[in-house]
Amino acid sequence: MSKIAQPTATDVGAMYDNHTDLMTDIMAGFIHVGYWEDPENPTETIELATERMTLEVLNRLRPSPGQHILDVGCGTGKTAASIATTHDVSITGITVSNHQIEVARKTYEALVETGKLNFQYADAMQLPLANASFDGAYAIESIVHMNDRRAALSNIARVLRPGSRLSIADLVLDDGCPDPDAIANWHELFQVPALISADKLKELLTETGFRVLECVDIRQHIRPICGVMDKKGLQVGGEVGKTLRGVAASLHGLEELGYILLVAERV
């Protein structure tokens, strides 16, 4: 088995600086996979699937009007803008990509000016935010990038008020399954350290001040993203296209790769 690197926040930020535009092109403006209700017959567009994934996270977060919500790994702001406008909340989005901040601030300038949205550079493992300053948080495919997940979850817990919810959507690896060489190119391309199991993530949450309320594995419902990536790889061509297609093939065939929707409460 090849050794999996432990990317730093700087490494992850550089990757997103370079690949965000491609990712948002693939995923209809979002930087997360979609949720297909019928993965065996995925006729839904990537637009509908990514919006449904956002809704799955939102339904578990249950924000109320006037609340201040933290978006951990905000990408270019599409998820934050959607939630802020539909639920009358204010959102602070953090990312380690300067390019993402620039795009988010420009795209949602009107919402930024009204104070509904704020985008800033911040590492979740060292959050420069005040204690108990948020009413909820969500993290969509961002915890997976962090080389110290305990530190990240501890920091998120610190900035949440007691009783607040944390809604997570992320990749996991089945318990006892070694991280296979088959997805080594995925780890390298997307700057992801060794994956952990859903049970390990729940354990970390419990140890860092959360009570897990729900955790469901929806791995089959995200599988069609591999076809989307393969198609984009054909369109892009070159080395990038070849890598995208290779990643898609590796992920599609890896049954041990899970994807969870989890919600926890700050105790």
Swiss-Prot record:
EC primary class: transferase
Domain of life: Eukaryota
Metabolic or biological pathway, per its Swiss-Prot or TrEMBL entry: Antifungal biosynthesis
Pfam families: Methyltransf_11 (PF08241)
PANTHER family per the UniProt record, alphabetical: GERANYL DIPHOSPHATE 2-C-METHYLTRANSFERASE, ZGC:194242
Protein name: O-methyltransferase
Family annotation (CDD domains): AdoMet_MTases
EC number, UniProt record: 2.1.1.-
Key word Heme present: no
Source organism of the structure: Pyrenophora dematioidea
One MF term in the entry's GO annotations: S-adenosylmethionine-dependent methyltransferase activity
GO biological process terms, semicolon-separated: methylation
Residues that, per the record, bind S-adenosyl-L-methionine: 100, 145
Statement: the UniProt record of this protein carries the keyword S-adenosyl-L-methionine: yes
Similarity comment: Belongs to the methyltransferase superfamily.
SMART domains listed in its UniProt record: PKS_MT
Keywords from the UniProt entry: Methyltransferase, S-adenosyl-L-methionine, Transferase
Record function comment: O-methyltransferase; part of the gene cluster that mediates the biosynthesis of the tetrahydropyranyl antifungal agent lanomycin that acts as an inhibitor of CYP51 and blocks the ergosterol biosynthesis.
